Amino acid sequence: MSVKTIISYDGTANDRDALALGRALRDRGASLVLAYVRHTAESDDARERAAQEEASRLLEDGAGWLEAPDTPRHVVLSGSTAQGLRELAEHEGAEIVVFGSDAHTAPGHVAPGTSAQRLLRGAPVAVAIAPARLRDRERVDLEHVAVAGGDSDPVTRETAGVLAGVGAEHLATPAAGSIDLLVLGSGPGTIDGHVGLSAASDYLLETARSPVLVLRRGVAIAFERMLAATS
């Protein structure tokens, strides 16, 4: 079964970084869904139709960037982007929500925006964050995957090993150079099935120079290598 993955997309440059990361996850067996959250409905019917059509066009452009025009797309109406994405993830049975970094992030750095930060505090779905300007890479591979040495949740190494195609003992550490993805587990005090970072993991997220995937406590993600990615 593929790993259903929602990409939060609003047409901004940094959300194209999220598309780039989503495409790399697709090469590992993820099935992608694009989502845009509208915060208010228009009181006038004509304006509401126009707003809905504009949101649909925006998501269509995102699917075009992915070179996958049949990618499922959802326009969500919610006062909170984080809440709207959380509810969509629960409804769709998604395992991951992917974000770009905050709009003011320096190239190559990772900085979760407000919505990502909210999901990182207790959401029942894994969260992935792309570094700024990831979209500029011709290809994003996930060959060199790192985990923190002190991560106590076994699902972290399990998931990272599947992504990298190596045994857990061969995974990189965050200090290693040329990392393609950092996988972080949720802290020991986190409710099972939810996301929650320890202070140490939060620091690793803030200093990361690669995409970051934060897993739910006790929940591994069963990625698969697609034939196209290994041929």
How should these model regions be labeled?
Residues 1-47, 71, 132, 141-181, ...:
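Small/aliphatic-rich secondary-structure junction motif
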Residues 10, 102, 124, 150, ...:
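Short glycine-/small-residue-rich Rossmann-like dinucleotide-binding loops
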